[in-house]
Amino acid sequence: MAKRIVFLMSDTGGGHRAAAEAIRDALYIRYGKDNVEATLIDVFRLSRFPMNYMPEFYPWLVNRSKASWAIGYNLSNTRGRANLLARTMYYTNARRFKKMIQTNPADVVVCVHSVITRAAMRAYDVLDMRPPFITVVTDLVTTHYFWYDKQAERCLVPTQAAYDRGLKAGLKPEQMRITGLPVDPRFMDSLVSKQAARAELGWLPDKPAILMVAGGDGMGPLHATARAISEKHLDCQLAIIAGRNRALKEKLEQTPWEQPTHIYGFVRNMPRLMAAADILVTKAGPATLTEAAIAGLPMIISDAIPGQEDGNVTYVVENNAGAYAPEPRQVAETVANWLHEGADALAQRAANARRIANPNAVWEIADEIWQWAHHESLPGKRRRRRLHRHREKSS
């Protein structure tokens, strides 16, 4: 009988769904699709107004109102406030959560979204018997207290910093494990040689390639940054990914460029693009940084969401895998300096990037989940209380 694995996530940014799908696909590959019944649930979509509009509101908030986002993130990031907000989310949506659980029976529950973790854990814990609950932290370094619930059976984290925050939040060492961040299990297999990737993509074989990414929604000043690099008249080629932002793609296509320039919309061949590139210009999203590290691609971080992505910048810079350049002019100057330093310096940064990666993370996470999928159901909060009272009477 197939094991039922429920993934709790939301499309607030692309990283949560990507992580859930990566783990699901690793389970399919490792244990067979006939043996795994995986369900992805966007919990915000099932929630009451206004939370059900978070997938639409989130990109605007983090891109257009960063100061407000930073204030909210930092004010809520204490043990007490995170718990209070999680309780509020649960009680506001208790009936909807109950229906979600009844409609989607599970042998194991996997949560890949910080805001959902504690509220969902509370929803499952009111059951008489509940499935094991596993949290997979998808923020790289700076992690919110929302992520850490002491009732979860496992909390799988990407870095030592995330592990240390879990300890501070009250989790026990045996509850946590450092695995790295999950990426598509086919990612490594798609990392062909630079020459092969460029031939497949139609890029010039002998010019350094600067890959520019703004995330799936095409957020950030990508056009201005690309123009700043182009106006340097460097001996290189540009590859610019506009994501789902059609207006940005059209603007890029209508712009005259001083170098050979390749323009893309939303892509599904990121491993090939990274394999073909020499330098990546990107925002500090954890999934893209992790993929770049696995690919051995030096990174110039041009933007970061306040709060959860601040630590990502420090992590990359302190490990000498990249640089931080928050203005288009600074990005262009960094690209020029790196190209001037030559191939050996770039190769060292590439080696540093690979050193901070764990390409096996998704397999380790899938194996952990599979083990828990075979675990017996666990007593919920009320049953635990009854068992405790029974033991007290017996003694």
Residue spans of the language-model regions?
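Donor-nucleotide binding loops and adjacent catalytic segments primarily
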Residues: 194-199, 203-276
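Active-site and donor-binding regions of nucleotide-sugar-utilizing enzymes
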Residues: 71-170, 175-178, 184
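C-terminal "capping" alpha-helix adjacent to the active site of nucleotide-linked donor transferases
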Residues: 318-319, 326-344
